[in-house]
UniProtKB/Swiss-Prot annotation:
A GO molecular-function descriptor: rRNA binding
Biological processes annotated in GO: ribosomal small subunit biogenesis; translation
Domain of life: Bacteria
Protein name: Small ribosomal subunit protein uS4
Keyword hit for Ribonucleoprotein: yes
Subunit structure: Part of the 30S ribosomal subunit. Contacts protein S5. The interaction surface between S4 and S5 is involved in control of translational fidelity.
Keyword terms: Ribonucleoprotein, Ribosomal protein, RNA-binding, rRNA-binding
Name of the gene this protein is made from: rpsD
Matching CDD domains: S4 (cd00165)
Pfam family, one: Ribosomal_S4
Source organism of this protein record: Rhodopseudomonas palustris (strain ATCC BAA-98 / CGA009)
Function summary: One of the primary rRNA binding proteins, it binds directly to 16S rRNA where it nucleates assembly of the body of the 30S subunit. With S5 and S12 plays an important role in translational accuracy.
Family as reported in the entry's similarity comment: Belongs to the universal ribosomal protein uS4 family.
PROSITE patterns (alphabetical): RIBOSOMAL_S4 (PS00632), S4 (PS50889)
Region (Disordered): 19-45
Length: 205
């Protein structure tokens, strides 16, 4: 198993949830955390603990975004009009790695980050190799021509375990995707419940 896969599954075990809905997640077989003490019964979390856990889960979902990056996104969310929790989700879903994952060009959020880093993605005809690049409504994302026949790309597009959300318009024959609109929390196909309002409470302490 690769280090990336180990990190991904470690997040699942720590959260005690299959946060991406993956069939091979270890929590499908056991419901305790990683390490030798993972089987110990955990006590009830404090309000702070619940808020921290919500933050760790959302950060982990988006390929373990660094705290610095995540907090910067939160700050931006608070400066936008409307609900800060909803804004936070909208900004996270505008990340290029999130769009590439949602479009089913790759099978995992971690793979999306690597795929972009290696120069396989174009936005509006220009190569972009920054996973955190902020996609705008109307932007067209495409897999570079030379990369369209990569086996793992073709395999990802056929994954039955998740569907492409309706705020992304995808043509898998051409390997292109259009970011149609900024989603609300209820639009995003999370495999588990995400609670951005708890993250707002965490940072507001």
């Amino acid at each position: 198993m690769t280090k990336r896969a180990e990190a991904k599954y470690k997040i699942d075990r720590r959260m005690g949830q299959n946060i991406w809905g993956r069939p091979k997640s270890p929590v499908n077989r056991r419901e305790y955390g990683p390490g030798q003490h993972g089987q110990r019964r955990k006590g009830k979390l404090s309000d702070f603990g619940v808020q921290l856990r919500a933050k760790q889960k959302l950060k982990g979902y988006y390929a373990n975004i660094s705290e610095r990056q995540f907090h910067a996104i939160y700050v931006e969310a608070t400066r936008l009009k409307g609900d800060s929790g909803e804004n936070l989700i909208g900004l996270l879903e505008r990340r290029l790695d999130a769009v590439v994952y949602r479009a089913k060009f790759v099978s995992t959020m971690f793979a999306a980050r690597q795929f972009i880093n290696h120069g396989h993605i174009k936005v509006n005809g220009k190569r972009v190799n920054i996973p955190s690049y902020k996609v705008r409504v109307g932007d067209v994302i495409e897999v570079k021509e030379a990369s369209k026949q990569l086996a793992f790309v073709l395999e990802a597009s056929q994954l039955a375990e998740r569907d492409v959300p309706d705020y992304i318009e995808v043509d898998h024959n051409k390997m292109t995707a259009k970011f149609a609109r900024i989603p609300a929390l209820s639009d995003v196909p999370f495999a588990v419940q995400m609670e951005p309002h708890l993250i707002v409470e965490f940072y507001s302490r």
